Structure formats: structure tokens, C-alpha cells
From Swiss-Prot:
The gene is CG30. Signal peptide: none annotated. GO terms for molecular function: zinc ion binding. A zinc finger (RING-type) spans 8-66. It comes from the Viruses. Keywords: Metal-binding, Zinc, Zinc-finger. This is Zinc finger protein CG30.
């Protein structure tokens, strides 16, 4: 992507960022949209200043989420380094006001005159052999670095896939073990219920036999008493018979 356009969600102003990847000279880029430090929502510095001016506690209330922010982040890109500046909302000041639209190039020329290049940069398509070699060298180095990164990512992805596969195998085994355990629990529960029913049946049978045994004991006692009475009566009968025989002439 050669150009990226960023828009402030409050004032709808647009900032354009060009890709200087193919430029032989290192370029410094300050991202035009800032990031609120607490809630991470983005807007432009002018909106930060205007919103902060309406408050009384030197903090800006985010228009998107209403969270208070005392700082905001500004991102700077230089070569292969991305730096972030944590700025205080209370320190934002309006530098000046113009009758029309402000000319950023003229403002930079006036404010940073000691940092101006003596010669204008060459047009985009007027690369010399040395510049082209430098660009190709950079491209080759970045391609090699990206290739190494891709290889490392591929190794990590392979290891991750293997780990996921092993985890899935363990999960499948755990599910099988859990299913077997559930089946065994069901079988044990069935055995316990059957054993409980058998014990209850035995208890009922024992109660029935105990009742019958008690009845038989009572009947045996009654018969024993009757037998004793009969024996006593028989003995008396024999005694009376013997006495009568003695008395008879």
C-alpha cells in the first residue's frame, strides 16, 4: 500500500501517510492521528485541545467512551524504529491561527529552517545506479529477514499444530475414559439397585419366616400343654382303673 489516509472521528479532517519504502533516503513520519492513552481511541491533536479547554481538570473526556484521559500518544516512524511520545493533555497549546488554511510546508520551513535540506530531493523516478543498488540491497535484506521470519512462523505453526493434535488425542482419550467410567458407574448403580432389592427380598422373607416360626412355636406350646394334660389324664385314668381292680372282689 503506497498511501494510507487517516480521518479524525470528531472533526473529520484527513491525514495522508505516504509509504517511503522505496526511497533511497530515510524518511521521518509522524502519524497525524493521536491515540488517547487510557481508552486507546483516536482523534487529532486539535480536537484534543478543544475538548480539554472545555474541561476543568486538565483531562480530556473521550467523545466515544466518556473516559477521562490525561495523556495521549504520538507515534513517530524513523528507519526501522517506531517511537511513541506520551504527551500531557494539559500541555497542548494552539501555536497560531491563520486567515485561511495553514500551509504546513511553509510553517515547517519557517520553524525548522536549520533542519532544511539544501537541495530538493530528486523526483521519484530519477534514481541513479547507486540509489537503485541501495534500494535493491534494502529490499534483499528485508526479504531475507521476512523469509527467516516466515520460516520461524512456519516452525511455530507446525509445533502448534502438533501440540493441538496431541491435545485433541488426549481429549479424545479422556472422553473415552469418561464414557467408560460413566458406563461402569451405571453398571455399579444397577448392581447396587439389584443388591438392594435382593436384600429387601431376603429381609421380607426373613420377616415372613420369623412370623411363621413364632406361630409354630405358639402352636407347639399349645400342643405340648395339651399333650401334658392328656398324659396327666391318662395317668389318672390308669390309677383309677388300678384302684377299682383292687376294690373289686
Amino acid at each position: 500500500m503506497d498511501t494510507v489516509r487517516l480521518q479524525c472521528h470528531i472533526c473529520c479532517s484527513v491525514g495522508e501517510i505516504k509509504n517511503y519504502f522505496l526511497q533511497p533516503v530515510d524518511a521521518i513520519t509522524i502519524l497525524p492521528i493521536v491515540e488517547l492513552h487510557t481508552c486507546r481511541h483516536q482523534l487529532c491533536v486539535m480536537c484534543v485541545r478543544k475538548i480539554a479547554q472545555r474541561g476543568r481538570d486538565k483531562r480530556v473526556e473521550c467523545p466515544m467512551c466518556r473516559r477521562k484521559n490525561a495523556h495521549f500518544n504520538v507515534y513517530s516512524v524513523n528507519r526501522n524504529s517506531v517511537d511513541v511520545l506520551r504527551c500531557s493533555v494539559a500541555d497542548v497549546r494552539e501555536h497560531g491561527r491563520f486567515g485561511g488554511l495553514a500551509d504546513a510546508a511553509s510553517l515547517a520551513r519557517g520553524l525548522f529552517e536549520p533542519s532544511l535540506l539544501e537541495a530538493e530531493p530528486a523526483p521519484d523516478n530519477s534514481f541513479g545506479p547507486n540509489e537503485l543498488q541501495l534500494v535493491l540491497k534494502r529490499l534483499k535484506a528485508q526479504i531475507e529477514a521476512q523469509t527467516r521470519t516466515n520460516y520461524d512462523l512456519q516452525l511455530q505453526a507446525t509445533a502448534l499444530e502438533r501440540t493441538i493434535e496431541e491435545a485433541n488425542d488426549r481429549l479424545g482419550k479422556s472422553r473415552g475414559d469418561y464414557s467408560d467410567a460413566c458406563k461402569l458407574m451405571d453398571e455399579l448403580r444397577g448392581d447396587r439397585l439389584r443388591a438392594e432389592r435382593a436384600v429387601k427380598a431376603l429381609a421380607d422373607a426373613h420377616a415372613q419366616w420369623a412370623d411363621k416360626n413364632a406361630k409354630m412355636r405358639r402352636e407347639n406350646d399349645r400342643l405340648t400343654n395339651e399333650n401334658i394334660g392328656l398324659i396327666r389324664d391318662n395317668n389318672l385314668f390308669k390309677q383309677n382303673t388300678a384302684r377299682k381292680r383292687k376294690i373289686a372282689p
